[in-house]
Amino acid sequence: MSNMIQRQARRAILLTPENEVLLMRIHEPGNEDVFWWIVPGGGIEPGESLEETLRRELREEVGLEDFEIGPLVWRRQHTFDWAGKRICQNEQYYIVHVSRFEPMMSDLAEAKVLDRFQWWPATELIHATEKLTPLSLPQIVAGYLDSGAPQELPELEILVD
């Protein structure tokens, strides 16, 4: 494996008025037996702002164009292997309130690792038997629904796979 890639990323927790969260089930390139559920988002391109990154990622990954970026609710540093590369990714998670829509991915490269989309009731996230990422997603969503955006962000979650 080559040197570690350092990357900044922004992700959106898409939340409906019915308290559903949109998740994407993805698998490792070339290994459809290893999969997990993630929220949409991705890496910051050179020169992009937070807003530009989230707008591009949500357009590419789920076809969402018209939305307002809500509060920052979580952050983590995730080190993992992807497509033969070691990546250390610093992620920030934002709430985005949306009406339920039919997601559609337009990024062909990412579509190769997408198994499906699913709207999950927030109350069912805690009972998920499949891997969610971040692992604390059920608590993040429940905390936001109970108390709104945190006054102070929790400690940086550090995860090394």
Question: Positions of the model-derived regions?
Answer:
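Conserved N-terminal beta-strand and adjoining loop/helix that marks the start
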Residues: 1-22, 42, 70, 93
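Short connector loops at helix/strand junctions that flank enzyme active sites
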Residues: 7, 34, 39, 67, ...
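Short hydrophobic alpha-helix segments
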Residues: 25, 73-76
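Unchanged
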Residues: 44-68, 76-131
